[in-house]
């Protein structure tokens, strides 16, 4: 089996549309919804563990893992965390070497699921909650994956270094010479979040925006989780992109950071989760997938991580801005795939990284 490049995804682009909107044409093949039964729990306990590959923040993953282990004593969870683009290559290399270590995969680049499904790498599984409470455009028609979380890549600023009236209000404002040497951003070749955000910004603003931004002496970091941290430490005054939820959590913890929802719109990212057909612990994987998409766990994502959920029964945490009140940029994972190599090449040339 060959190692997949991002271009391989294009072969499946007409068969699927993933990430904010899944293909409606592929409906009717999903398996019957499965409940979390005592028999499933017992089978999972016999397997003893579940291995999750994920791009979610390590503290979030650890909190999630502890909650799962508390809910199902006797089953441990091993979380392998990395940037989505790195995970994409790692999984391809492992499959090429006939290594099947992962049970469950969660990615911040929804388009990764296109080649995984196309190559038969995913196991169909639909939990009761996914079937009942997840909109069709946020779950695969064949039951291979569902959107576990939604988040944003926003602008932000350090309120100890920047007055509210002086803070940027738009992406165009980031091009003001006064922000030169004062900004930080993530890298699209490492982070699926930043890859998706970069595509949406190129689509809306053109490469001209990034050409001008690259002249602003921006601090370059890898993960989308890094810019909020640099911001809170005062290493830079403004965040050009990065996880909005990281900023929200830091602000709630008393750090001097403030998110900005740009007038042009804010990039939106979906993070689906699926089970590998080759999962060494298939019952534990099903149990985790079912548990992950329950109302209680989805509420956890909202309350603890400041991300968003499409589960029909969850509610926004008091005091936080609702996603419906934010102007959003539209997701288009097939478009990301069509431009991914161009984005990597041009970005590296412009930012010299």
Regions found by a protein language model. Give the residues of each.
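N-terminal secretory signal peptides and thylakoid transit peptides that target proteins
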Residues: 1-17
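Short, polar/charged alpha-helical segment
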Residues: 34-45, 49-51, 55-74
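Extracytoplasmic ligand-binding site segments that recognize negatively charged/polar headgroups
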Residues: 54-65, 77-95, 100-228, 232-235
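A ligand-binding cleft/hinge motif common to bilobed small-molecule-binding domains
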Residues: 111-115, 237-256
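Periplasmic-binding protein-like
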Residues: 150-152, 179-189, 211-214, 220-221, 253-279, 292-316
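A bilobed periplasmic-binding-protein/Venus flytrap-type ligand-binding module shared by bacterial periplasmic
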Residues: 154-161, 198-199, 269-281, 300-301
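Extracellular/periplasmic bilobal clamshell ligand-binding domains
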Residues: 297, 317-353
């Amino acid at each position: 089996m060959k190692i997949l490049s991002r271009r391989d995804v294009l072969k499946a682009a007409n068969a699927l549309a993933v990430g904010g909107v899944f293909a409606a044409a592929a409906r009717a093949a999903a398996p019957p919804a499965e409940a979390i039964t005592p028999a499933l729990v017992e089978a999972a306990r016999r397997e003893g563990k579940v291995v999750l590959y994920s791009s979610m923040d390590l503290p979030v993953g650890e909190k999630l893992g502890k909650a799962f282990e508390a809910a199902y004593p006797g089953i441990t969870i091993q979380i392998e965390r990395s940037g989505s683009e790195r995970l994409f290559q790692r999984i391809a290399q492992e499959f090429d070497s006939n290594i099947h270590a992962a049970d469950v995969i969660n990615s911040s680049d929804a388009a990764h699921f296109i080649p995984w499904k196309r190559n038969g790498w995913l196991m169909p599984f639909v939990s009761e909650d996914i079937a009942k409470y997840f909109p069709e455009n946020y779950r695969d028609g064949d039951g291979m994956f569902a959107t576990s979380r939604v988040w944003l890549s926003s602008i932000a600023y350090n309120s100890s270094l920047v007055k509210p009236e002086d803070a940027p209000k738009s992406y165009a404002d980031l091009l003001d010479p006064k922000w030169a040497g004062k900004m930080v951003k993530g890298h699209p070749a490492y982070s699926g979040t930043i890859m998706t955000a970069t595509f949406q910004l190129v689509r809306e603003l053109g490469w001209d925006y990034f050409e001008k931004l690259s002249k602003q002496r921006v601090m370059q970091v890898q993960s989308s989780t890094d810019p909020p941290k640099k911001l809170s430490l005062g290493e830079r005054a403004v965040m050009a992109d990065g996880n909005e939820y990281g900023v929200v959590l830091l602000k709630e913890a008393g750090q001097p950071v403030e998110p900005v929802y740009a007038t042009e719109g804010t990039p939106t990212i979906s993070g689906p989760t699926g089970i590998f057909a080759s999962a060494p612990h298939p019952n534990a994987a099903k149990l985790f997938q079912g548990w992950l998409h329950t109302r209680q766990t989805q509420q956890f994502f909202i309350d603890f991580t400041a991300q968003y959920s499409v589960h029909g029964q969850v509610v926004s945490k008091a005091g936080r801005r609702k996603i419906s009140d934010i102007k959003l940029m539209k997701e288009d994972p097939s478009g990301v795939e069509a431009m991914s190599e161009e984005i990597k090449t041009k970005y590296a040339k412009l930012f010299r990284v």
